[in-house]
């Protein structure tokens, strides 16, 4: 490689990478060089001496040693804190019976004003009614949201309740109940509360059972029955069913016989006929039946007999005429369904 090539390489390196490390160090050395003026000032500062005057007979110690002794000194021991003992006094339990008790407030007591019950005071008796004056605050005279009218209604209600439901009246009503009392006298309110808490009071009668037999309830019959036996009935040749019934005259407390009950049944109505005869028997009535005062009246049947003959194509229990359905058969509305089709 020739010198020209080496020079070109050096120039390229300088162009690409800048100055070398040696050249930089030389530049730093040159830049750090001190001027003679600065060197003279530093020498002047180092020539300053500190002189400390001491008294005769004392030895001056260097400043460095004194600083070291001050820095090395430490407290030898921590200061002791004096602890004061607290004496605990034990109090002996006092007898509660002898101790003074604060006065109790009876919340059920009725307040009084000038010795008069507050519920008995009439507001109209006050000549000067300050709560009616304009600008007056009604809460200064009536508490709990009351006003003049609601307070009067409340007083009337409280007076009525206290008069009707007083303990004295209740205990007096208990004394009138038949039966032996537990102690022979009217029980005190405390005894009465104890008895009510334990169950039904033993001196009160037990009520009769609900839904029990009527003989136990004091009844001698189950339902009213007829006093007379004036039943004029006729029998048909086909069915042999009773076709008439008489009007009841009076009611007594005797139990009816089975024959009377059968004759009074709805099946023995004069309008119902047997399936064999298909004829109606005209009932005969007793026009001389009387009610209490002996006045004779005529009895009219509530439902006249039918003059139309019945067909035997359907049961006698149904009077609805059969209607043909789309299968050209007859259907009846019976127990078999609403529209029963007799297809077969």
UniProtKB/Swiss-Prot annotation:
The keyword Nucleus appears for this protein: yes
Name this protein carries in UniProt: Pre-mRNA polyadenylation factor fip1
Keywords: mRNA processing, Nucleus
GO terms under biological process: co-transcriptional mRNA 3'-end processing, cleavage and polyadenylation pathway; nuclear mRNA surveillance of mRNA 3'-end processing; pericentric heterochromatin formation
Similarity remark: Belongs to the FIP1 family.
Protein's UniProt keywords contain Nucleus: yes
Region annotated Disordered, chain positions: 1-99, 230-344
Compositionally biased spans, kind Basic and acidic residues: 80-92
Bias type Acidic residues, positions: 39-50
Function: Pre-mRNA polyadenylation factor that directly interacts with poly(A) polymerase.
SS bond partners: none
InterPro entries: Fip1_dom, Pre-mRNA_3'-end_processing_reg
Organism: Schizosaccharomyces pombe (strain 972 / ATCC 24843) (Fission yeast)
Domain of life (superkingdom): Eukaryota
Compartments (UniProt record): Nucleus
Chain intervals with Low complexity compositional bias: 243-258, 302-317
Record's compositionally biased regions (Polar residues): 28-38, 271-301
Gene Ontology, cellular component aspect: chromatin; heterochromatin island; mRNA cleavage and polyadenylation specificity factor complex; nuclear exosome focus; nucleus
PANTHER family found in the cross-reference section: FIP1-LIKE 1 PROTEIN, PRE-MRNA 3'-END-PROCESSING FACTOR FIP1
């Amino acid at each position: 490689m020739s010198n020209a090539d080496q020079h070109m390489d050096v120039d390229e390196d300088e162009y690409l990478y800048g100055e070398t490390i040696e050249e930089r160090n030389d530049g730093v050395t040159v830049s750090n060089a001190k001027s003679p003026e600065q060197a003279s000032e530093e020498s002047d500062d180092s020539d300053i001496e500190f002189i400390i005057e001491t008294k005769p007979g004392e030895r001056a110690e260097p400043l460095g040693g004194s600083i070291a002794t001050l820095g090395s000194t430490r407290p030898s021991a921590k200061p002791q804190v004096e602890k004061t003992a607290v004496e605990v006094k034990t109090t002996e339990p006092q007898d509660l019976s002898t101790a003074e008790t604060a006065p109790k407030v009876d919340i059920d007591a009725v307040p009084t004003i000038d010795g008069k019950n507050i519920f008995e005071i009439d507001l109209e008796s006050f000549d000067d009614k300050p709560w009616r004056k304009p600008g007056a605050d009604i809460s200064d005279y009536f508490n709990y949201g009351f006003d003049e009218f609601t307070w009067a209604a409340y007083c009337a209600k409280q007076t009525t309740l206290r008069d009707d439901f007083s303990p004295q009246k209740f205990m007096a009503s208990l004394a009138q109940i038949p039966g032996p009392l537990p102690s022979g006298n009217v029980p005190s309110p405390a005894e009465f509360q104890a008895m009510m808490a334990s169950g039904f009071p033993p001196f009160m009668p037990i009520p009769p059972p609900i839904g029990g037999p009527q003989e136990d309830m004091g009844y001698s019959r189950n339902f009213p029955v007829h006093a007379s036996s004036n039943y004029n009935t006729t029998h048909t040749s086909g069915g042999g069913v009773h076709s008439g019934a008489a009007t009841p005259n009076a009611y007594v407390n005797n139990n009816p016989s089975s024959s009377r009950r059968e004759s009074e049944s709805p099946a023995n109505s004069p309008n119902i006929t047997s399936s064999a005869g298909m004829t109606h028997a005209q009932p005969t009535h007793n026009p001389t039946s009387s009610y209490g005062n002996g006045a004779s009246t005529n009895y009219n049947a509530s439902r006249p007999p039918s003059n139309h003959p019945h067909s035997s194509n359907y049961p006698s229990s149904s009077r609805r005429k059969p209607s043909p359905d789309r299968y050209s058969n007859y259907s009846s509305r019976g127990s078999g369904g609403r529209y029963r089709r007799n297809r077969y």
